[in-house]
Amino acid sequence: MMKLSLSALAVAAAVLTTGAQAQSTGYHVTRKTDQVDTYHGTPVADPYRWLEDDNSAETKAWVAAENEVTDQFLAAMPQRLPARRIYTELYNFERFGIPFREGGRYFWTRNDGLQQQNVLYTATSLKDGLKDRAAVALDPNLLSKDGTVALSGVVPSRDGKLLAYGIAGAGSDWQTWKVRDLATGQDLADKIDWVKFSSASWTADGKGFFYARYDAPKEGEALTGANYFQKLYYHRLGTAQGDDVLVAENRDDKEWGFGTEVSDDGKLLIISVWKSAGSKNGLMVLPLPKGAFAGGKPQPITLDFDAQYSPVAVVGGKLIVKTDKDAPRSRIASIDLKHPAAAGWKTLVAEGPDAMTGASAVGGRFLLSYLHDAATLVRVHGADGKRLSEVALPGIGTASGFGGRWDDKETFFSYTSLTNPAEIHRYDVKTGAISLFARPKTAFNPDEFETRREFVTSKDGTRLPIFIAAKKGLKLDGSNPTLLYGYGGFDISITPAYNVTAATWLKMGGVYVIASIRGGGEYGSAWHEAGTKLHKQNVFDDFIAAGEWLVVQKVASPTTLAINGGSNGGLLVGAVTNQRPDLFAAAVPQVGVMDMLRYQKFTIGWAWATDYGTSDDAAMFKALYAYSPLHNIKSGVKYPAVLITTGDHDDRVVPAHSFKYAATLQAADTGPAPKLIRIETNAGHGAGKPTSKIIEERSDILAFIANTMKLEVK
């Protein structure tokens, strides 16, 4: 339990008074102000605006006081300790990342089970699998005592001798990049600061790499200030960051950002230009010299930002891209770099009935990943685009990986389902042979459970898949404790994949369900766009329909059904809780976007406008105001139990979203069920979170839901 110091308590007493307790959890009353904003003639109160200042003593005292109330409640739950024990047992298994090869060396990550961060390993051969003859390339567990410093990216040089790597602290999106000599295990003097939303791309000679960064933020604004005007640089080893070569920027458009990759032959820099968190982007290329890079002017291929253009490879002077231009479910196109006008693009692989979600070029073949009703299929095509075969996956689930270069003979992939942890497989590109490389051994027995795919009809007649995992022999009597998860945004597909939260809930006697709803990419760009902007309500309708289906089919009932989602999924949970509080027993929005009128004012929030729109537009204001979780809490209506989670260092979705939502929810008359907020200290949006914090937070979530449903956990 968090202990408040005397000084913190003194400050808390000044800003938080213990008023009449509307609910049994003993909330403090959060100070209100008379802040009112007017949007297109509509006045909107924002009484907790002061909570947006995460650096103020008042906000820090509020955080401490809220955490104390929450932890007292959680500590008293009989389900807390057994849930944590089960979660720890199921989390404690050896896990492997997907291997990749560079310069005659293989690289992969491994975690013994309860290590705070995954460790990067390397070996020149994988004849003995992923354990023997491996050397530690980089162990981030040595970078901090509490495990809060994580690897944000690793990129070996072409010869496999050097490793560019990014580190991030306390869950922040800000990264610092360094370079390690893999022969000595020592870091070079090079240090790159203020990197965000970028990786590194080495030149073929290994003398330097490309990366993107922002200007240093103003003092006190690192976690909240808006991120604009990203710039693309080349860093030459042995030089100061201040001497890096500026490759690309756009002084006339503050939203431009850059992603890079160098072609397999080292002759071309391919630049993806993004303007938002959506999938639409532009493309530029820059020929690279044989000698030292000293700069150059990128040549545009397309800067219309009208579709997705994902580089796959450069083959025979042609740039191969995966694109949804004139193909909502995507196609593979070939661009002649000497004549790159769109009119001359050739289709190598036409759009099919399933959504193409990934493409790689390995061993002279194209490996194309598709989703068929939210489960992975992988098809193999020749250099001419002709379909050759299909990768024989183990079952209905999710496969990922398949990386490599055009002249590689092998590639690796992972396969997982709701009840099977990720296995690592090797795929021989020429023969199509698959060999198992690593299969985790866990305390979870998948043979005791089954997963089935069902289809739900939404409010407007749209058909959507859901996946239900449960113990074999499930009784359909409405009594099953059921946890429904969703996301529904940014073209991100929700597919069946193993996670310890689901496994723990199943082990506790529950049913776990994921819903593949609009806003995601399960059926292509049209499916995504049907859940954006003025159509965002479709996302909520889909999720509500999934919940109603579970009740009608007697999988669950309103007293045994809980919902959960994070980030955009936190918005989903918040909105649906407001719209159908009668349908759920518990709701857990994690790091959610709750203030839809001001989200664009913080860090990278402006980039979400492609999915949400902004309150600056009158029509969008009306739509946003109609569902914004913060602005639609209904006083006088009985709400389910709510546990809000966030991190005090979240610089993706700033914690003020959750702070203001929690304060508003606690102040409203929403019935006796608890309305709590759990604020993780020294943690961010989720990436890089240490194992101990993951176990504590997620087991608390499951214990909270179980407690609400009076589920006994042994």
At which residue positions do the language-model features occur?
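Hydrophobic beta-strand positions that form the internal "hydrophobic ladder"
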Residues: 106, 163, 209, 269, ...
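A flexible loop/linker signature enriched in serine peptidases of the S9 family
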Residues: 111-118, 144-149, 167-176, 191-196, ...
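Beta-propeller blade signature
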Residues: 122-124, 178-182, 226-238, 283-289, ...
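Active-site-proximal cap/loop segments of hydrolase catalytic domains
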Residues: 508, 514-714
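Cap/lid segment of the alpha/beta-hydrolase catalytic domain
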Residues: 138-157, 165-172, 183-190, 427-433, ...
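Non-catalytic accessory segments flanking enzyme active sites
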Residues: 57-155, 166, 256-314, 347, ...
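Polar, glycine-rich mid-to-C-terminal structural blocks
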Residues: 230, 234-274
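Gram-negative bacterial Sec-dependent N-terminal signal peptides
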Residues: 1-21
